[in-house]
């Protein structure tokens, strides 16, 4: 026989379960924190991962130089990238052994070139701005956007900087401090030999004796 305390506890539990939808009122709980939105272009790590991890076999074959496009069995017959209806592996492509030939390079470049484009700066101007050891290029007659000033003054500056450059490029600090490169410190003048000094002393002694 069930006691009255157990019956009261069970009834209270049923009442709480019945009132729970009314308390929530059918509305979901608000999110605790707003989700952080990633940038439109993505970070460098995400771009590199997109290059290294293609989504499908089609993109894999387009990005990998060693693997040709996938051809199902029975399609294409003697296609250069297939061998008896099967996809040629990387060993056949790299060694030249087999019935298929090496496919042409993709238009977008290899994986290494795509990763280097992500990591390296876009232009020489941004590279010179980020590198403290290399200054901006000084070119005679430059200044197409703002008039460029006097051309003779630009030529004088270019002649002045001829001793500070190496094959048209500015020498870095290492070349100046260690004398490595095409600009070297001039050799010191040779020291006077002892022969003229001895002749002068002999002449002075002979004049005193006379």
Curated annotation (Swiss-Prot):
Residues 201-210 have a biased composition (Polar residues). Keywords: Disulfide bond, Hypotensive agent, Secreted, Signal, Toxin, Vasoactive, Vasodilator. Its main location: secreted. Pfam families: ANP (PF00212). It comes from the Eukaryota. Residues 122-134, 156-176 have a biased composition (Basic and acidic residues). Residues 122-210 are annotated as: Disordered. This is Natriuretic peptide Oh-NP. It comes from Ophiophagus hannah.
């Amino acid at each position: 026989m069930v006691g009255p305390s157990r019956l009261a506890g069970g009834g209270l539990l049923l009442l709480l379960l019945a009132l729970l939808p009314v308390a929530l009122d059918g509305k979901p709980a608000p999110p605790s924190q707003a989700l952080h939105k990633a940038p439109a272009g993505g970070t460098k790590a995400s771009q590199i991962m997109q290059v290294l991890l293609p989504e499908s076999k089609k993109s894999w074959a387009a990005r990998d130089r060693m693997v040709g496009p996938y051809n199902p069995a029975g399609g294409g017959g003697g296609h250069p990238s297939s061998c008896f209806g099967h996809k040629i592996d990387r060993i056949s492509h790299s060694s030249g052994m087999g019935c298929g030939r090496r496919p042409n390079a993709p238009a977008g470049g290899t994986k290494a070139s795509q990763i280097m484009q992500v990591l390296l700066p876009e232009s020489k101007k941004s590279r010179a701005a980020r590198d403290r050891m290399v200054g901006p290029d000084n070119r005679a007659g430059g200044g197409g956007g703002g008039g460029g000033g006097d051309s003779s003054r630009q030529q004088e500056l270019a002649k002045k900087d001829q001793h500070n450059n190496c094959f048209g490029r500015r020498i870095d600090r290492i070349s100046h401090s260690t004398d490595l490169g095409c600009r070297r410190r001039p050799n010191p003048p040779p020291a006077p030999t002892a022969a003229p000094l001895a002749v002068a002393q002999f002449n002075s002694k002979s004049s005193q004796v006379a």
